[in-house]
């Protein structure tokens, strides 16, 4: 595969790289997933929030008297802290808190970590908007991936220098790390459709299908001719588009295969690194070093991993440039003004992308489902960890083991779901629905704890700590499927040539929903004083996207995406003009994309 094939498809715009996808390029794609997924699982999902809370705790005082340090240094302070803790426990739940002063405002150490991640998600959403559309143009895709990878990994390594006295710096580094992580994943995802489109397997299938069982697209409105095929959208006369089931199946299967393999590699590396991190914590704690130094060392190690594997991924991936940016944006301008122009261009592009997405019925249905689905996944993860730490009284090591169990199951899930799909001839959206139905077992099992005779047993319904581990296996299996199938499924529904912009919309939808579910769960916990009632909300939240995912038709979505790409006229420099959709008679055709297919 290194040498590619002899026949190259025609470029869709000037300077497009239509060279066949090589094994080297695929290794680069997998390598960055290997680098960044480790940080996402080990740092963001495990040790980073604990580190932030512990750094703040060492500078905090008990809420009960606002005098006693949270980390007592001598016997008297330890005795006072113990008495205060016992008294506060007797007064009622959740009154024994550790508070810290942040710029004149008193915050609990736990909420300090929560607010940090909330700010990170908000800043990440802004950054995604500002850079993703730019990644679709010129040679910025690979440059941005490298920039975010190096910046994020170095920021993680700098945690080694953050001592409790400057714990606020840890909050700043967290924001930088999370922003870089999210943006780099969006850019990496934008490579997936291009790798599939230029893969020799897909090109070979298209060559064999020409002149045989090609299925022409029906006109969007009467009197309109069919649009051009996906790989020749802006050249020559209108032609029939080959969207036969065989070609579509080839695209989708290859996309899912690449995505699943990437997720599996990332999860496998995450499990291995997490085991090493636990060993680092164990041995450093045995040495009696500072309580935050082991955690900071772990973050340094994870950041080093991210940096190390980013280097070969940048070397192996091609630029795969998109259409050039409009000349007026950058010629003869200073650096700052150029950056402002790029940012304004990106926000305008997002708004145009949203308007295009609204006109694509299948994309719109999927994004609504994805909003609910991603919110459910994020909320159930946070709720389960909180439930384990509070109501099941599980320690840090036990929770870390739970994380390893779930991640290991994710590896199995990423491998098994494609086998199940092939064995039973299931469509991609059917696999996603199966994953959601399996995930539904988690909150339903938690709700069993409300049934009187189950309570009388003393086991079942998440009354014992060991019951959460089988649920962790289920959660991991589901995540292994959803992580690969959702992004590959979405990639086939978007207009070609706008990959980064639409994957940014995909990520923004994900991040935008992540604050909704946890906030509602927080309100439920505040009102009831328990976490278990939140399982009822989670059961409903998981069920809502199931019918929407079932409704999505990938074949019709591909047809709509190709038509929409054809409606987006190309300027002389290869830049796609979104405004042409509304500024011409083709706007009526775009509206037709929202109609049901007969």
Curated annotation (Swiss-Prot):
Instruction: Tell me which GO cellular component terms the UniProt record holds.
Output: vacuolar membrane
Could you confirm whether the keyword Transmembrane helix appears in this record? Answer: yes
Instruction: Mark the transmembrane ranges.
Output: 28-48, 111-131, 159-179, 182-202, 263-283, 297-317, 363-383, 400-420, 431-451, 465-485, 489-509, 534-554
Region (Disordered) residue spans = 1-20, 209-237, 573-598
Membrane topology designation: Multi-pass membrane protein
Name it.
Autophagy-related protein 22
Superkingdom, natural source: Eukaryota
Protein's GO biological process:
amino acid transmembrane export from vacuole; autophagy
Q: Which SUPFAM superfamilies match?
A: MFS general substrate transporter
Q: In the UniProt record, which residues carry a glycan?
A: 74, 80
| Basic and acidic residues compositional bias, start-end | 228-237, 585-598
Protein role: Vacuolar effluxer which mediate the efflux of amino acids resulting from autophagic degradation. The release of autophagic amino acids allows the maintenance of protein synthesis and viability during nitrogen starvation.
Species the sequence originates in: Botryotinia fuckeliana (strain B05.10) (Noble rot fungus)
